[in-house]
Amino acid sequence: MGKEDGFRTQKRVSTASSAAAGVLPTTMASGGVRRPPPRGRQIQKTFNNVKMTILCGFVTILVLRGTIGINFGTSDADVVNQNIIEETNRLLAEIRSDSDPTDSNEPPDSDLDLNMTYTLGPKITNWDQKRKLWLTQNPDFPSFINGKAKVLLLTGSPPKPCDNPIGDHYLLKSVKNKIDYCRIHGIEIVYNMAHLDKELAGYWAKLPMIRRLMLSHPEIEWIWWMDSDALFTDMVFEIPLSRYENHNLVIHGYPDLLFDQKSWIALNTGSFLFRNCQWSLDLLDAWAPMGPKGPIREEAGKILTANLKGRPAFEADDQSALIYLLLSQKETWMEKVFVENQYYLHGFWEGLVDKYEEMMEKYHPGLGDERWPFITHFVGCKPCGSYADYAVERCLKSMERAFNFADNQVLKLYGFGHRGLLSPKIKRIRNETTFPLKFVDRFDIRRTTPLKIEARS
């Protein structure tokens, strides 16, 4: 048929005859001379055929998996991935529980005797003299540098992961905010994630840590506790420590609410300062006995609710216990307590976060009061927990605004700022120059002179 008639197909011959003839079965022109294809091309063709076979097999497997079911022919990789997920979930469940598989030989916690007074540790006496001697013997560790008291900021969070992933993200933002402030103002910082005393968990965990830091760092003059849900929002403002020369505890509050109304919110323990001295150790010893979890804390809660105005019925918390202690033993303690309200050592978030734009328009950082709050405290939000007193979305948006409001003050030195108080993205706010030092002189917070706090009537 046409040109095809000029071709014929040779039959396969036996191996012996083929070898004898020196030919392979092929298609060739009738009567023509056989010209075998180049060896390289033949190998390439064979290789292509193998690749096509493998590809077809792979496609077939995919079709079968999609048709019969996703679990058909589960690969080893799928099994490994599933095992990783299960192991991760198991570890998270273990971490969130109170049990520790490594503590199998540890005896269970015994209930504390309600008739015994709980203590934080051995009674420390003459601490002021011992500390003074230590400072004299260790001149390389002064408690004052250039006339400025050495301060250590203590904060922290529970040792377990948050109940929701976004909570861990905001804990990270919170500690970043605190690190920025401490770096700018030459303050040391300790982030604690350990419960040093099993009996004092939750709100009370700060007490044993404060005591331990005092005794382990005699060179520190002030220990400053700050909750993880509190953010610095005035990065320029500095606490006027010289104002507290004759006091050992500085805490935000209102004397009228404390003494006249005996309110359970007269003081706030989300941010306060303790001087490293014998008086502070004695106050911690007097404060702690209401804290042990279980029957002691529950019974103490009933006493606090009965004696403090507006307090709901729940177990004893550290804030209510301190207020009750200062009221019931006023003559013993109040002389050395400074109840501060001239600036926001604690600023309740609800009345502040929606006014940040107005503050930026009218005022400037460094004021520390309602015009530009020093600290914005998200009381009741509990970003790390599974419940809160306020809507989660409202809390998270407000925390984002507070963080970015403060972060803009830090980024300004570098020529950047957030696109908006709800945006994590940043934008350039000025062009770079060949004379960068003029911006250091102008925008470096460390070169800002702190404003003097004037007493208000």
From Swiss-Prot:
Q: What is the membrane topology listed in the Swiss-Prot or TrEMBL record?
A: Single-pass type II membrane protein
Which EC number(s) does UniProt give?
A: 2.4.2.39, 2.4.-.-
Output the superkingdom of the source species. Answer: Eukaryota
Sequence ranges on the Cytoplasmic membrane side: 1-51
Q: Which residues are glycosylated?
A: N115, N431
Its annotated compartments are:
Golgi apparatus membrane
List residues in topological domain: Lumenal: 72-457
Q: Name a single GO cellular component.
A: Golgi membrane
Instruction: Name the Gene Ontology biological process terms.
Output: xyloglucan metabolic process
| Membrane-spanning intervals of the chain | 52-71
Pfam families (UniProt xref): Glyco_transf_34 (PF05637)
User: What molecular function terms (GO) are annotated for this protein?
Assistant: xyloglucan 6-xylosyltransferase activity
- Name the segments for region: Disordered: 1-40
Please write the reaction equations for the catalytic activity of this protein. Answer: Transfers an alpha-D-xylosyl residue from UDP-D-xylose to a glucose residue in xyloglucan, forming an alpha-(1->6)-D-xylosyl-D-glucose linkage
Name the UniProt key words of this record, in alphabetical order: Glycoprotein, Glycosyltransferase, Golgi apparatus, Membrane, Signal-anchor, Transferase, Transmembrane, Transmembrane helix
Q: Which family does it belong to?
A: Belongs to the glycosyltransferase 34 family.
Task: Outline what the protein does.
Answer: Probable xyloglucan xylosyltransferase involved in the biosynthesis of xyloglucan.
The protein here is known as: Probable xyloglucan 6-xylosyltransferase 3
Q: Which organism is this entry from? A: Arabidopsis thaliana (Mouse-ear cress)
- Gene encoding the protein: XXT3
